[in-house]
Every structure is written in structure tokens, then in C-alpha cells.
Amino acid sequence: MRNTVSTFQELKDRGEKITMLTAYDYSMAKLIDSSGINGILVGDSLGMVCLGYENTLSVTMEDMIHHTKAVVRGTSNALVVGDMPFMSYQTSIYDAVYNAGRFIKEAGAHAVKLEGGATVAEEIKAIVKAQIPVMGHIGLTPQSVNMFGGFKVQGKNEKVAKKLIEDAKILEEAGAFSIVLECIPEKLSKIISESISIPTIGIGAGKYCDGQILVYQDMLSMFSDFKPKFVKSFGNIGESIKDGVSQYIKEVKESKFPEEKHAFKIDDDVINKLY
């Protein structure tokens, strides 16, 4: 049975943790979905891990719709959330509702995610009014990387911490069904999670959130050159892939692959007529 926004709320209400991961294509979505995950975020992080951009700012709506379609086709259980990219909702409330609608109508997503606190409250209200579920996102919001001066922990001083608490309450009031808390101190995320009735989903926000999300390439160690402090390795897929590719190259070079069992047969009398 498909997880829904109601499932997320039910899990919080009974004290059961919510599990989420990112996915960007059909194959990985199918694997993650079959593992029993509650939700999949088609994150604009695809700009960095799939498209090779330095940050998420270059990702377009067309990129997001394309990848979200693929993920939806690979799932039957997880709630699929489409990440609204930079400048798809900041320009006007009309654009916010229109682009959120594209995720639902064209891509088949079940909800959308917006970054920001009080500044996007009106956009969230309008999207929810259009019957589209919205996941909020506060703390380190990657689309604001230039304002933050880099990817830095947020909420370490009293002023910013109080603003994050207030932002969470505003997002709940605006109609968000859950909120991602990214890169904020663990004790602050505990206060926020206890201050609102909707679920919090942490990424680098400690154990007190109602759920957790990670980028699957990070938690499966697909890239060895970058590993955020908050990521635990749950597998070493990157090394396995490199080992497999290296072995493939070796066997092709040495004519060990393909073997007879990998080849298709033809009768010798047919072959003889071809010479």
C-alpha cells in the first residue's frame, strides 16, 4: 500500500520513525522502494550527484519533471516528493502553484518540497489551497548557499535558532504536512520537533527528528571524495562498482569474456553456407 501524507502523520503520532532517501531514476527508485522506505525525495541535489553541477542552482523544472517521472514509475509503496528547484516558486505565487501542479499532473509526484521559512509561507498556503501537499525545508537550505556563504550549520546562535523555531511554526500554520530540518544542532531540532504537531525529517539534524533522510549516494559511499559529517556509510557501493568495472576491463582485454555460455548458437551447416 502506498505511503501518504497521512501515513507520515500517523507514524509521528505513534512515535515511529519515518524513513526517507533520495532517488533520481527508475532503477534506484525500484530498489529503494522494495526495501520498505516510507518516502522518496526526488531532490534538486540531482544537480550535483547526477548532473555534475557545483550546487543545486542550475537545476531546472524540466530536469526535475524528467527525473521525477522515472522515480514514480519505479515505486508502488513510497510517498514520492518532488523538490521544487531554484526560481520555480520564488518569482510569484502563480508560478509556485503552476510549477507545483506540474509535479503532480505531469510527473505523478504525491507532494512537493519548498525551501524557506516565513518567506515562502504565502506560496505554501496557495499550493496547499490547490490541493497539493507541501513539505517544508528550513535550516541549511542549499538554494540559499550564496546568502549563507557556503554550506554551513544553521541555528548555532540564539537569534537564528529562535527564527528557525518560529519558521517551523509558520510553515505548519501555512499547511505544510512535514518539514525537513537540515544541518542544525541536535538539541535545537528536538525543540522544533516538540514545538509543532507535524513530522520533522532530519538531515544532519540529530536523532530527535521524527524521521531521517539522506542522499543515497552518500549513505552508500558511492563517492569517496566527499562525505558530510552527518552521513554514516551503510555500504561501499562505490568500491564495488569500481572493482566490478576493473574486472570487466581485465577480462575483455584478456579475451576471458564473453565465454561460450554467454554466446548464442547457430547450426554449423548454416555457417558453412555463409563462406
From Swiss-Prot:
The keyword Metal-binding applies. It holds the Pfam family Pantoate_transf. It comes from the Bacteria. It is found in: Cytoplasm. It catalyses: 3-methyl-2-oxobutanoate + (6R)-5,10-methylene-5,6,7,8-tetrahydrofolate + H2O = 2-dehydropantoate + (6S)-5,6,7,8-tetrahydrofolate. Binds 1 Mg(2+) ion per subunit. GO terms for biological process: pantothenate biosynthetic process. One of its GO terms (molecular function) is magnesium ion binding. The active site is at E182 (proton acceptor). Its EC number is 2.1.2.11. Keywords: Cytoplasm, Magnesium, Metal-binding, Pantothenate biosynthesis, Transferase. Coiled coil: none annotated. CDD domains: KPHMT-like. Homodecamer; pentamer of dimers. This is 3-methyl-2-oxobutanoate hydroxymethyltransferase. The gene is panB.
